[in-house]
Regions:
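Amphipathic alpha-helical packing segments from all-alpha helical-bundle domains
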Residues: 73, 85, 89, 105, ...
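Secondary-structure edge/capping motif, primarily at the C-terminal ends of alpha-helices
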Residues: 83, 102, 118-121, 178-182
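Helical hydrophobic small-molecule/effector-binding pocket
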Residues: 88-124, 142, 168, 172, ...
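Hydrophobic/aromatic-rich alpha-helical bundle segments in the mid-to-C-terminal region
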Residues: 109, 127, 131, 149-197, ...
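Short coil/turn segments at alpha/beta junctions that flank glycine-rich nucleotide-binding fingerprints
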Residues: 28-32, 83, 151
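Generic detection of well-ordered alpha-helical segments
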Residues: 12, 16, 20, 24, ...
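Helix-turn-helix
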Residues: 17, 21, 25-59, 63, ...
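Hydrophobic alpha-helical connector segments
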Residues: 63, 77-108, 160-167, 190-193, ...
């Protein structure tokens, strides 16, 4: 981290300071209660600098989310290289990892704000950033699905991209329901979403010893 900061340009260093300050204040005071002026004071920059770099407070929050996703990529890559043998268990474990990463640094309030910003300004920066985050997860799911197809554990004639869109769409809906609720744990989120994942995969799972087209009946 120190080496990376040493190679940053002055602008990049200011952006890092702003994001660090915002993360700390959002965690301790909450997103809505934190003013841009307070972030600027903590980061030792002018409020105008923050507006110049991010335009809006929601955009700053989206950039913070992007930074956390970039930091989380090595953990996801390690998981994708060592998937569980059972596809349902693998996807459930990946959903748990995504949930843990999402809530590790950003609160439910922050996630609600980001989702709302994408709806309010569908062509805005927040919406574009949200689409990038979603596309990344979809690509990772495509990799998971194709890996299980290559292992003979998922039917081969299902389009991996389409199945990925379905899984991510349902998971995103459930995450939105979760963060909009007054309280709850990651276990509560998984309790809501995992039955839907199991239903999506019904009839697509193959027994380890089966021929490629034989499907498991899920009770």
């Amino acid at each position: 981290m120190a080496a990376r900061k040493a190679t940053q340009t002055p602008r990049e260093r200011r952006v890092t300071k702003v994001l660090d300050a915002a993360q700390e204040l959002f965690a301790t005071r909450g997103y809505e209660a934190t003013l841009v002026a307070e972030i600027a004071e903590s980061a030792s920059v002018a409020p105008a600098t923050i507006y110049n770099y991010f335009s809006t407070k929601p955009n700053l929050l989206m950039e913070l989310a992007l930074r956390h996703v970039r930091a989380a990529l090595p953990e996801r890559r390690a998981f994708l290289k060592n998937l569980p043998e059972n596809p349902l268990q693998g996807i459930e474990a990946f959903e748990r990892l995504l949930a843990e990463q999402a809530l590790r640094h950003l609160s439910r309030e922050c996630w609600r704000t980001m989702m709302a910003a994408q709806i309010v300004e569908p062509r805005g920066r927040a919406a574009r950033t949200g689409a990038r985050l979603n596309d990344l997860i979809k690509r990772q799911y495509v990799q998971i699905i194709r890996t299980y197809q290559a292992r003979g554990r998922l039917v081969a004639d299902v389009d991996a991209s389409t199945l990925s869109d379905l899984v991510v769409g349902v998971a995103t809906m459930n995450f939105a329901r979760f963060v909009c609720g007054p309280s709850g744990t990651i276990e509560d989120l998984l309790r809501i979403g995992l039955p839907h994942i199991a239903l999506i995969l019904r009839g697509l799972l193959l027994d380890k010893q089966s021929r490629p087209r034989r499907r498991i009946r899920m009770e």
